[in-house]
From Swiss-Prot:
Gene Ontology molecular function: mRNA binding
Domain RRM: from-to ranges: 90-170, 180-259, 284-356
Summary of subunit composition and partner proteins: Interacts with RBP-P. Interacts with RAB5A.
Organism annotation: Oryza sativa subsp. japonica (Rice)
Any Pfam family: RRM_1
Protein name, per record: RNA-binding protein L
Amino acid sequence: MQQPPSQPQPGMGGPPPPPQGAAGQPPQWGAIPPPMPPHQYGAPPPQQPPAMWGQPPPQAHYGQVPPPQPYYAAPPPQAMPAPAAADEVKTLWIGDLQPWMDESYIYNCFAATGEVQSVKLIRDKQSGQLQGYGFVEFTSRAAADRILQTYNGQMMPNVEMVFRLNWASAGEKRDDTPDYTIFVGDLAADVTDYLLQETFRVHYPSVKGAKVVTDKMTMRSKGYGFVKFGDPTEQARAMTEMNGMLCSSRPMRIGPAANKKTTGVQERVPNAQGAQSENDPNNTTIFVGGLDPNVTEDVLKQVFAPYGEVVHVKIPVGKRCGFVQYVNRPSAEQALAVLQGTLIGGQNVRLSWGRSLSNKQPQHDSNQWGAGAGAGGYYGGYGQGYEAYGGYAQPQDPNMYGYGAYAGYPNYQQQQVAQQQPPQQ
């Protein structure tokens, strides 16, 4: 596949001219400003260019993104502005951030535009650790819209990742259009989100993004991912046309995936057993909830068999749930990711990790098949894309790149869960 030409990245262009009327010594660049009290949120960060601005970033492997046209604005007033109306929202949500990406890095990403007012990244209240998402406020709604259209889906500076941006409010600008998602397996270890996205985008213009699922501990690829489309016709074409085509050094295996829901999700937190089962590398059991009472164990096995060798299937008598155990963990992970929200019989099922059968209770125990884990182990609530778009346990924008907010991008590494809705047809 022909790679796009290498060009500069957004936010890494030449230094902008200093703002007119600036006085005094330039602020020290690179230091994160001290936390501001809530009533000062929105105060502008320094408008001066960084001292090391001219340093070129490392060359990315799969092509770069042309820089946006710079827009410079006079420093905004220091007084707290009046609350913006719905049509004046000028804050963007940014997600799928790595743990080392702090306010300084995010500010530098957009500094060349001259339009950044403030950056706020969300941290865990107890540990203080960054949660992988935050908010960037710009000088105007028009500026925020330009940045959203220019940067979203493009490469971030100095890292093989793409920007995940969306409006921070529930305004009319939010992308609520349906997504049509496919599963992509057998990916080479060097395939990134950007490479997977561009592999499809050159053939299908409606591609909205792609996500390679990674191990949350090692951050290494699990060998599969998802691509989402805005056009169901292109999604259907890609299912056949791209199956067996090369991505990097290996042919891809394409399969169906449940699609983004257009309705909200009810988030729940998994119980301790559910979290333990999810993180157990030896657990190969999947809980299947919301099961049609007419579905038999043989039917359930037929549905799950394409993703690996199934060693056991159980549907407890009188229960609308079941359990599927695989020989190995990767098979279970792929099945959980691909079949989440799938229509089996007359019902859309919800999947989660069941209790490891190696630790199951005696026969008379009602939890022997992992019902305790299934009760709180539903996946979703990307709460990311993400899910996430995977690996961050934080609430995310469910309408932007919500890998976990809809079954096509299940952020099953997270500790957040959701009641699944039927997929878009």
